[in-house]
Amino acid sequence: MKKFFEGLKNFIKKEPVLFAALLLAVLAVCLIRPGLELCLQAIDFRTLAILFSLMIVIKAFQSQNFLDFIAARLLRLCKTRRALYFLLTYLVFFSSMFVTNDVALLTFVPITLLIFRRIELPALHIVVLETLAANLGSCITPMGNPQNLYLFSYYSFSALEFFALTARIALPSLFILAVIIVFLTRRKLADHGGMAEPHELSGNVLQTQVVRLKADFRTALYFADFVICLLTVFHVVNYLIMLGFTIVVMAVCNWRLFKKVDYSLLLTFVGFFIFTKSLSKVPAFTDFVNSLLSSPLKTYLTGIAASQVISNVPAALLLSGFTENGAMLLLAVNVGGLGTLIASMASVISFKLYTAENHDNYFVVFTAYNIVLLIILGIIVYLI
């Protein structure tokens, strides 16, 4: 019994969101008794299949050193600290649109820490910037993060509708990130009358980052699989065809990739699907949530607030069942990825990577950046 509770404690510590989702689903099934048929109807198998396929094909790209290779080549172009900040930040921003925010951070934060050790500069602010860039860049495409993929399917957005909405986040974000970088990399020199000047990088410290691309027949199959995944997202290819193709490709090319899929995220979705559908059968709860989502502004504020407490993916799953205003909810949970450390679980990744090697006040700096940007961007996005 002692081992059981120790195991449970470790599981909760490792997977708190998954534990909460499963617990809520079990409680809902026991108390509300929705029935097996309703539970199966609640699960969006298409979203789960696309999410699974995207996760495994991105792991495949990582196994080929694809992102590392591109990053290493581009970094050789940097001559100043400002250029390095811009390149790293926007690499994360644009790559997160296609490989998700967490993969972008898992790829580029370690590279960033290595580079900044070599050039003997503190990496605190650039890692925070990369985290902001990952969360904001991933907002732009349906496959950029799990909540976008789910909401794109749930509300049946057209591609034009979706990108018109996410552009309201993308355009201000690009400008704000640029302003922050220029401010951070200014260098006040007395002999320049206090004007700002970017630091130059001495020597060839960025030339030593050697990464070899593992280009072979598998790379071509992975690209084909990725294209099929994108076509499935936009309803061109049936999700069962995509799933079958993905399973065959990965089984032939590298079956070990199946072990690297984040199955806890898939189970988290299942838990919240069942919990939300079950609660929709409780009139009192439905009336309460509907009152919180009764107007576009209320939906926007509720989505942001919920994201701060339970993270934006669960917020999207929970609130989507109670509002037809998909546009405002989409904006809310993406803007709501800013703010607290758990507002976007991708933020926890960079926090762990940075604090494993450094012991300065990352949490304070991260929170300060995020709260300020949440307020500024939250107002801008709503008013546009």
Which residues fall in each region the model found?
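Transmembrane helical segments that form the transport core of multi-pass membrane transport proteins
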Residues: 42, 64, 71, 224-321
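Interfacial loop-to-helix junctions that mark the boundaries of transmembrane helices
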Residues: 8-14, 37-47, 159-169, 213-214, ...
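Membrane-interfacial loop-to-helix junctions in multi-pass transporters
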Residues: 45-47, 75-89, 118-126, 217-220, ...
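Hydrophobic transmembrane alpha-helices that form the pore/transport pathway of multi-pass ion
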Residues: 89-90, 94-139, 150, 316-331, ...
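Hydrophobic mid-bilayer segments of alpha-helices in multi-pass membrane transport proteins
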Residues: 4-6, 10-33, 44-56, 218-229, ...
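Membrane-embedded hairpin module used as a gating/binding unit in multi-pass transport
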Residues: 177-181, 189-190, 194-259
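Cytoplasmic-side transmembrane-helix entry/capping segments in multi-pass membrane proteins
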Residues: 45, 72-76, 81-82, 125-132, ...
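Juxtamembrane and boundary regions of transmembrane helices in multi-pass small-molecule transporters
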Residues: 2-3, 160-212, 342-384
